[in-house]
């Protein structure tokens, strides 16, 4: 993960990857991940690595938001340090990262191209009624979402996602398009 400015798209070389002008979605990878939907929330199963990394990822994101001035050190020590922030979790899968971000006070939108994963995320989130007002899951691509949500979010998180993206330039450009002006992005 890194913290990037709105000009991040200028920093990513192509590495010989052919960029599609239409979508960043790797359909084969989406299908593969969708097949894991039933085990997504099993902390001892195939997703155990994501679960085990979560505390570290959350701390990294919150620290990144402090370091970029989005939240203060005073906010950092509150039970809900992200209160009032609008976050987009792109490639949220079954919601392993989106749920704790919402519990920390952020109004969180989880976005994924995998319908089965979004369905699992919604079912799991419904077990905690406190999340209902702060967490929304959407089955969509970043391209579609960005077209209707320009300069909407305080931060965009794309954790453990870039390696699953077919067109990295389009992906990052569309993520950045959803950010409010002069905001940085933990990714």
For every predicted segment, state its role.
Residues 2-47, 51, 55:
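N-terminal, positively charged/glycine-rich alpha-helical extensions of SAM-dependent methyltransferases
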Residues 29-35, 70, 93-94, 147:
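Short hydrophobic/aromatic-rich motifs at helix boundaries and adjacent loops
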Residues 73-187:
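Conserved SAM-binding loop
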Residues 37-40, 44, 65, 69, ...:
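A general structural signal marking secondary-structure boundaries and capping sites
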Residues 32, 36-40, 60, 64, ...:
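Solvent-exposed, charged/polar functional surfaces in cytosolic regulatory/catalytic domains
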Residues 52-83:
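Conserved alpha-helix/loop element of class I SAM-dependent methyltransferases that forms part
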């Amino acid at each position: 993960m890194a913290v990037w400015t709105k000009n991040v798209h200028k920093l990513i070389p192509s590495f010989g990857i052919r960029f599609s002008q239409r979508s960043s979605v790797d359909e084969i990878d989406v299908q593969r991940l969708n097949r894991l939907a039933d085990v997504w929330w099993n902390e001892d199963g195939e997703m155990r690595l994501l679960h085990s990394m979560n505390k570290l990822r959350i701390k990294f994101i919150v620290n990144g938001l402090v370091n970029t001035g989005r939240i203060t050190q005073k906010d950092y020590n509150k039970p809900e340090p992200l209160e009032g922030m609008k976050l987009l979790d792109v490639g949220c899968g079954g919601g392993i990262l989106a749920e704790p971000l919402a519990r920390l006070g952020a109004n969180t939108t989880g976005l994924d191209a995998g319908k089965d994963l979004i369905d699992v995320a919604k079912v799991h989130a419904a077990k905690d009624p406190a999340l209902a007002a702060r967490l929304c899951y959407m089955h969509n691509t970043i391209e579609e979402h960005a077209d209707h949500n320009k300069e909407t979010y305080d931060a965009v998180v794309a954790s453990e996602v870039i390696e699953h993206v077919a067109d990295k330039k389009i992906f990052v450009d569309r993520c950045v398009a959803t950010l409010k002006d002069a905001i940085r992005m933990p990714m």
